[in-house]
Amino acid sequence: IKENMSIMEKLEILSDAAKYDVSCSSSGVECNNNGSGIGNSKACGICHSFSADGRCISLLKILLTNECIYNCRYCINRASNDVVRATFTPEEVCDLTIQFYKRNYIEGLFLSSGIIYSPDETMKRLLKTVILLRSKYSFGGYIHMKAIPGASEELIKIAGYYVDRMSVNLELPTNAALKKLAPAKTRDNILKPMRMIQNGIHSDVQRLKSSSVNVNRLSGEHTVNAYDDIFDTALSSDVYRMNNSDNSFFNHYNSLYSVAGKFSDTDNNSITGYSNKRSFVPAGQSSQMIVGATDETDYHLVTIAESLYRQYDLKRVFYSAFVNVNMDESMPLQIDGKGVPLLREHRLYQADWLMRFYGFKASELLSEDKPNFNSLLDPKC
């Protein structure tokens, strides 16, 4: 336990703790030039992702906290691990994001978290952060935020209007694997927020059509100049009406963040004001699966990804080759580079591309008789 940490000490801990979430493509790389050129790469939280038009964008990638009530066997932040714990306040995340943005280090924020106290408490802290960013700091950059399985639907609904993308990690391919490695998590709890987000996006598309607002949902880019009036002080008169048992949370917002809108507990869960000015999760949702922690085949993995695309309208499924950070002898070990090969992860991404962009079915790429890709061959072969 380390007390009175500086914000930079927290950044070092919480950016490193976020590096195993591959929903953004790269992070944790530090490289200093030798004096013969210009430019240094810092490892603290800067990762690179790609927009729908192919641009590479830099994101501040951090956890709100690495404290966690769960004890997932594959996770470095599990409750039983003796690691230094740190927690950002919402204001600290906002300050870091704005300072990095002003210096042109980043174009947006990727915000995830360990589960502190409960899913609802964690989701509330994440929500406080993005409301502050959008309202108090008038931040118009890209925000990707995790939706926490087990959190209330109302919190996820509100968050969807403040962020560009949300993601819910599937974690492991099967319910049996979850029971074995993450017994506190269930498939139903993970799929429920995915369905909430999907339904919210569909409902919002209909709302936007009825109000004749032209939003290009495929790219997540607003073809009307929607950002011009999102964050003005008129938001203080907006009203978000919804049911939630934790009235103190919303009363807290009424007093501290009135610029972002007021919350009350009446009128059939309708959300007005901010939602009329911005679409719901405009860049869509994504998910992530760990590859190789259990014995699922590539065929099983691409079949699950195909189902997520078709049944939940996901924009991306990410694959993360398992790294045995806890050196658990009952799980695949990485010793001298052996273990789950990164090339397997790469082949899954290539197959995923064929499904997303060229309409291939999982059954056209693999079968139960031939369930795995040849790591030496591109799936197109």
Residue ranges of each PLM-predicted region?
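Flexible, acidic/Gly-rich N-terminal and inter-domain linker regions that tether
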Residues: 1-67
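Short, charged beta->alpha transition segments
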Residues: 60-63, 91-102, 273
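Hydrophobic residues within beta-strands of alpha/beta enzymes
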Residues: 75, 108-111, 166-168, 317
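Short acidic, glycine/Ser/Thr-rich loop/turn "cap" segments at secondary-structure junctions
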Residues: 77-83, 110-119, 143, 178
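Short Fe-S-cluster ligation motifs
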Residues: 96-112, 351
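Conserved AdoMet/S-adenosylmethionine-binding subsite of the radical SAM
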Residues: 117-354, 358
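Conserved alpha/beta core segments of nucleic-acid transaction machinery
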Residues: 366-381
